[in-house]
Amino acid sequence: QASEPCADRFLRREVVIRPTVLVRSGAVALLCALLLAWDVDLLAAHGVAQGDQGFFLTNVGAAIGPFMYLGAKHMFTGYDHLLFLVGVLFFLYRFRDVVTYVSLFTLGHSVTLLVGVLWGVQANPFIVDAIIGLSVVYKAFDNMDGFRRFLGFQPNTKLAVLTFGLFHGFGLATTLQELSLSQEGLVTNMLSFNVGVEIGQILALMGVLIALSFWRTRVGFLKHAFMANALLMAGGFILMGYQIVGYLVNAS
């Protein structure tokens, strides 16, 4: 069905995808990431602006409006989330499918964001963010029909989106944990922050959907779909590289 994440009308073009092309592209992207990521200051995928850090550290008590604003701001600047969602939406044509997949992602990252911060569940942030980078690689590879073409099977896309959503939320939770938020009004503030994230996500997705809808009307959309997802995959490898180097540098 055309509404599936890997669109049949793209597959019917029988685009020739050579494994060596994917391997070389991934290797080059990962090498560039390793070189760039050696500057540890660039490693934070969920970095918080200096001014925002000051608010998080000094705020005491419930602050619904500011936390909603900061949540929405994070979504607009969270390039890892946006890249993954672009991959998820790339071949979704029906509104019902868009709602389904976005809801699964939202459920996943909302659960781990709240559980991670409110219950203090912790993990190495570099490992979590590397998995987030992997989620971008996965979705681009899925859009290119890589699993069926090269591995002979097709993962459950809905389960994958939900699972990776858990890691995306946990990645944000690890960042907030480092800020030692005040316990006073924490539940209200985290719920407000999460609502803000969802508002920001809706606004960002509206822009993505408008751009994709316009692009799909162009004659060259299907022709350029493979290259677009190859670039998306490269972006995922770069995100992974940042975090892998960060883990190695901090472990040494």
Q: How would you name each of these model-derived features?
A:
Residues 16-77, 153, 241-252:
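Histidine-/acidic- and/or cysteine-rich, low-complexity loops and terminal segments associated
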Residues 73-79, 84-251:
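Hydrophobic alpha-helical transmembrane segments in multi-pass membrane proteins
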